[in-house]
Amino acid sequence: MQITIAIQDTTGDDQDFLSLQVFPDMTLETLRNSIQAETSHHPSTQHLYHNGNLITDNSKTLTQLNVTDGDMLALHVRETQRATAVPESQQGRPAAPPQQDPEFLRLQFLANPALRAEVERTAPDLAAAINDPQRWAQLFRERYDREQRERAERHRIIQQLNEDPFNPEAQARIEEIIRQERVTENLQTAMEHNPEVFGTVHMLYLDVEVNGAKVKALVDSGAQATIMSPDIAEACGIMRLVDKRYGGIAKGVGTAKIIGRVHTAPVKIGSLFLPCSFTVMEGKNVDMLLGLDMLKRYQACIDLAKNALVIQGEEIPFLGEADIPKATEEALQDEPTIEGPGGTTIGQRTGAVSGPGTAQHRQGQAGPSTAAQPGPSAPAPAPASASAPAPRAPQARSFPREHIEQLVALGADEQKAIRALEATDGNVEYAASLIFEGF
């Protein structure tokens, strides 16, 4: 028959599965020896569990222990006190040279453009100090010490939770810790190998004329209808043509009030004059939106390779970043952010990454915890920063208690958990990721 062994090591970092072909009359001692042959774990360190019960009688057969075909056994590898004494003495030796010489590495990065580019992608804060030996050494040691503390803290938490391995709450916390580590690894992998996904994608705008008035129109093939704001409809002189019988409420991502509909009005796109109908709607941050109704009617093609809208053979180029409405940029500046690797910040809605140089500016707007730290040290010369922490006090108390306790269970103190929740607008998953990154 075949059984599966779920192996958990002493650190709790690695879990493996082992499939074994066994016989019903095989003793537990023979099974331990088979596991040792496959994994090199000594039988004295093997703690086997079946259906949540520790099995210790090595003389009993698998049949006597009620182990049947297809069963899974849990194996927890726990070193004895005498066996762990040797690694403790050996841990001092690797800690003696904990890292390479920072100055040697700095010179290597300066001499190798490829390595330097890699540092700029993965650790922008180090790359900014590469020409300052003292600053480089300081940041290098701080980074190494932080990683060591985080690793030791994770091991300590997992070891504490493994003291009661069949406690559902403990296992749920271990699962959350492992999941957050995978999320962080996934983020770092994306920033290293696919950094373009973190750039800001600007919307597609065109210069058009409606009834002779110039308007910047957003091209949105995901919108069902062509939309115009009441202010622009008034400026274009077509507000008097609104048929209010078509009023109502638009529901989608949120709701908006529909004032009515303009059944037809001339729109100039490029050199083409095209009749178009408009839905006049409040509550949108865009002056005019060319929807799918108009794009399909005139068989328009959004050609991203040419960065143009093609209508009836004419190519109308989309506006550049500097020409799009400023309201779009202001919305991006007000976007809440979370901390990313190497001192970067990541927008929660767009995923856009900002370097360390712009992190402090955005922290003053989005309110991460680091913006509140300089306030007490210099309240007098910086009234703007001193006023920022003022609304934080009531906000810190608004987080659910269970969210704070989840972060405390990951090794953070209560104040650190609250600051992490403030920095992520109450998102527990992002807050846990910040704590693991040394927030």
Curated annotation (Swiss-Prot):
Any Gene Ontology biological process: proteolysis
InterPro entries: Aspartic_peptidase_AS, DDI1_N, Peptidase_aspartic_DDI1-type, Peptidase_aspartic_dom_sf, UBA, UBA-like_sf, Ubiquitin-like_dom, Ubiquitin-like_domsf
Ubiquitin-like domain segment(s): 1-82
Protein location: Cytoplasm
Positions annotated as active site in the UniProt record: D220
Keyword terms of this UniProt record: Aspartyl protease, Cytoplasm, Hydrolase, Protease, Protein transport, Transport
Xref: Gene3D superfamilies: Acid Proteases, DNA helicase RuvA subunit, C-terminal domain, Phosphatidylinositol 3-kinase Catalytic Subunit, Chain A, domain 1
Pfam family, one: ubiquitin
Enzyme Commission number(s) from the entry: 3.4.23.-
Major enzyme class: hydrolase
Key word Transcription regulation present: no
GO terms for cellular component: cytoplasm
Positions of the UBA domain: 398-438
Region (Disordered): 82-101, 333-398
Biased composition (Low complexity): 364-375, 383-398
GO MF annotations in UniProt: aspartic-type endopeptidase activity
Family: Belongs to the DDI1 family.
Subunit structure: Binds ubiquitin and polyubiquitinated proteins.
Role, per record: Probable aspartic protease. May be involved in the regulation of exocytosis. Acts as a linker between the 19S proteasome and polyubiquitinated proteins via UBA domain interactions with ubiquitin for their subsequent degradation. Required for S-phase checkpoint control.
PANTHER family listed in its UniProt record: ASPARTYL PROTEASE DDI-RELATED, AT13091P
Protein name: DNA damage-inducible protein 1
Organism from which the protein derives: Neurospora crassa (strain ATCC 24698 / 74-OR23-1A / CBS 708.71 / DSM 1257 / FGSC 987)
Lineage, top ranks: Eukaryota, Fungi, Dikarya, Ascomycota, Pezizomycotina
